[in-house]
Amino acid sequence: MPLLLTGRTFRRDLEAHGCLAVHAPLEGGAETRLLRRLRGAGYRTRLWSARGLGDPEVFLTQKHGIRPPHLGHQSVGRGAAVGEVQEVVPQLGDLLDGDAQVALWLLEGQVLSQSELRSLCDLCSREPRLRIIVEMGGARSLRWQPMSGLLAS
């Protein structure tokens, strides 16, 4: 498996397209090998689950509000009609500091809608240092394609 030894082809495709859809073997290991190769090439990497991502662009790049779980407690006039809102810093804020390339690997990407996947592609085109890999399901062997190609079909 020369791909897992070097990762050059994967890195070239990632740099050319910006956003890739990956089908990885279910036993795992491929994502960490490729992330290790990307780190060796100078990328700053992060591995996240796509579940609970919400609006991907806002979650990743902007300061946004979240509501903590209710847990059955009564509020005694401490919040608005919609409940307490806490402000959260952007998740990619610290990674985008500096000049290094950033690679974000999203697990369980099959739960994302078409519009969310399109917004991830748009985010990659607006931020030239950001590369996003979305795991779209399992396969017997590692394969990938540009996200734009997946969305077109």
UniProtKB/Swiss-Prot annotation:
Reactions catalysed: a plastoquinone + NADH + (n+1) H(+)(in) = a plastoquinol + NAD(+) + n H(+)(out); a plastoquinone + NADPH + (n+1) H(+)(in) = a plastoquinol + NADP(+) + n H(+)(out)
Chief location category: membrane
Key words of the record: Membrane, NAD, NADP, Plastoquinone, Quinone, Thylakoid, Translocase, Transport
Record localization: Cellular thylakoid membrane
Its EC number(s): 7.1.1.-
Membrane topology category: Peripheral membrane protein
Pfam families: NdhN
Bilayer-spanning residue ranges: none
Top-level EC class: translocase
One cellular component term from this protein's GO annotations in UniProt: plasma membrane-derived thylakoid membrane
A GO molecular-function descriptor: quinone binding
Summary of subunit composition and partner proteins: NDH-1 can be composed of about 15 different subunits; different subcomplexes with different compositions have been identified which probably have different functions.
Similarity field: Belongs to the complex I NdhN subunit family.
Function: NDH-1 shuttles electrons from an unknown electron donor, via FMN and iron-sulfur (Fe-S) centers, to quinones in the respiratory and/or the photosynthetic chain. The immediate electron acceptor for the enzyme in this species is believed to be plastoquinone. Couples the redox reaction to proton translocation, and thus conserves the redox energy in a proton gradient. Cyanobacterial NDH-1 also plays a role in inorganic carbon-concentration.
Protein name: NAD(P)H-quinone oxidoreductase subunit N
